Amino acid sequence: MTQKPRNADYTKEYNRKAVLSMLRRSSMSRAELARATGLSRAATSLIAEELLKDGIVMELPPQSVGRGRSATPLAVRADSYYALAVDLARKSCSVGLCDMSGHLLQFRAFPDQDGLLDLIIEALRRMAQSVDKSKILGIGISSPGPLDCEGGKILNPPQFDRWHGVEISAILSQALDLPAYLEHDVCALALHQLEMGHSRNFMLVFVDIGIGAAIMSGGELVGNSRYFTGEVGHTTIRFDGRQCACGNRGCLETYASIPALLEGSSFSSWRELADSAEQSPEAQRLVYQEALYLSAGLINLLNLIPVDTIYLAGDVCYRYELLAAHLRQEISAKALFGSTDSIRIYPSSQDPNVGTLSAADVVFDKFFRI
């Protein structure tokens, strides 16, 4: 007797999330929602009325759909809910308040310093006071890994000693009386990239002092993406190669991370290298070398989980086309799944506040996810 109500409640919530997930991407009429979700028009209309009543969606001006007919699109209300966001980076931290449309309403940035956690909490409290707190869904936290995301704990990311062992989710949740969700920065970036709507089957690759990757398949983070994020840099590309800090030899990170690439060269940064690539044979050689090593690690993943797009993030976003041309050539020649034209390579979002927006998307993903 207790099973039926639980199943009915689950089905109702599932259908509601299905409608909301569609509306998050774009405005749609009730008829379009019914076709997109597979729900009946009656069920879709009932859900729409509930969402309108709850103030989560709104009606837009009617639009002509031909033959003298019109339809009234529905859209998510930007001010229906909010998310607080914390983006932890190695040299800085940013805190923000975002609405349901992904607009960054408030923003604070702090350099790495003593007492940083107290500054973060104070900034979050001030932002929370500026809106109806009952509409704040939670706090999204983006951080380099390795992390214990389920436990909300930052483990031991390199060059991140200040945060080692900090149970950040519990601390912020207790301080703000809100749920807090910790996520790998690369996975958070992938969630944000998904919401930009260009692809639902992609790999996002982050290259700086380390290498991380997250994979989206059909709009879902692949189950082991959180594993890939921390470990792709430690896949072996040369069994007798360089010693890695992890204890193994020949890890991708020892060849394709930016510090490894620049070691022994005349360049101090990827930007300097890229700016010299048109005139400097050394720079040209290093760009090709980066593509060669990076592709060796990525092809292993692509052969298991094909995607149509690769997004480059981190330092290599700058003048990305230099690297993309060589990467595409290597992948085309060595991957199992297709030709040069079968995969697109782009830079990830270049919004200067992308880290903060991505942390907010961790919260919104929890709300919208079916």
Regions found by a protein language model. Give the residues of each.
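ATP-binding/phosphotransfer module of carbohydrate and carboxylate kinases, centering on a glycine-rich
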Residues: 1-62, 66-135, 197-198, 251-370
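Short glycine-aspartate micro-motif
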Residues: 83-87, 136-140, 202-206, 212-214
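Short, acidic, Ser/Thr-enriched surface-loop or helix-capping motifs
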Residues: 99, 149, 216
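Glycine-rich phosphate-binding loop and adjoining helix at the ATP-binding site
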Residues: 104-201, 322-333
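Glycine/GP-enriched mid-protein hinge/lid loop-to-helix segment characteristic of carbohydrate kinases
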Residues: 107-109, 163-164, 170-281
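Short, active-site-adjacent cap segments at secondary-structure transitions
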Residues: 146-149, 187-190, 212-213, 222, ...
